[in-house]
Amino acid sequence: MDLIKIAEEAFATKKELPSFKSGDTITVAYRIKEGNKERIQQYRGVVIRISGHGDKKRFTVRKMSENVGVERIFPIESPFIESITVNKVGKVRRAKLYYLRALTGKKARIKEKRV
């Protein structure tokens, strides 16, 4: 018996999340606790990478806020994620979109896949 696998299965959230990949624009509803109050924050941006495997899988979302790029890493199995919605399906040729960090304006746009 592998004790690590037993512990991972016990703490797994088993949420049904939509499938998405790098280049997709998604909205993550994330639960934030401030003091004794709790609220849900919507974080919308482009997925620039998906890394890890299994329960340790995580994804990085990049958004522009007041002309400043903000990146946030979310674990897939986080109990604080309320929901994930896919807004746009991007058309990219790379798995990791680190080159978006250096681009600004219209150059940083990603082509949209026709659905």
UniProtKB/Swiss-Prot annotation:
Gene Ontology BP terms: translation
InterPro entries per the UniProt record, alphabetical: Ribosomal_bL19 (IPR001857), Ribosomal_bL19_CS (IPR018257), Ribosomal_bL19_sf (IPR038657), Translation_prot_SH3-like_sf (IPR008991)
Any one GO MF annotation of this record: structural constituent of ribosome
GO cellular component, one term: cytosolic large ribosomal subunit
Gene3D superfamilies: 2.30.30.790
Pfam families per record: Ribosomal_L19
Taxonomic superkingdom: Bacteria
Record keywords, A-Z: Ribonucleoprotein, Ribosomal protein
Family: Belongs to the bacterial ribosomal protein bL19 family.
Function recorded in the entry: This protein is located at the 30S-50S ribosomal subunit interface and may play a role in the structure and function of the aminoacyl-tRNA binding site.
Database matches in NCBIfam families: rplS_bact
Name of this chain's protein: Large ribosomal subunit protein bL19
Highest classification ranks of the organism: Bacteria, Pseudomonadati, Bacteroidota, Bacteroidia, Bacteroidales
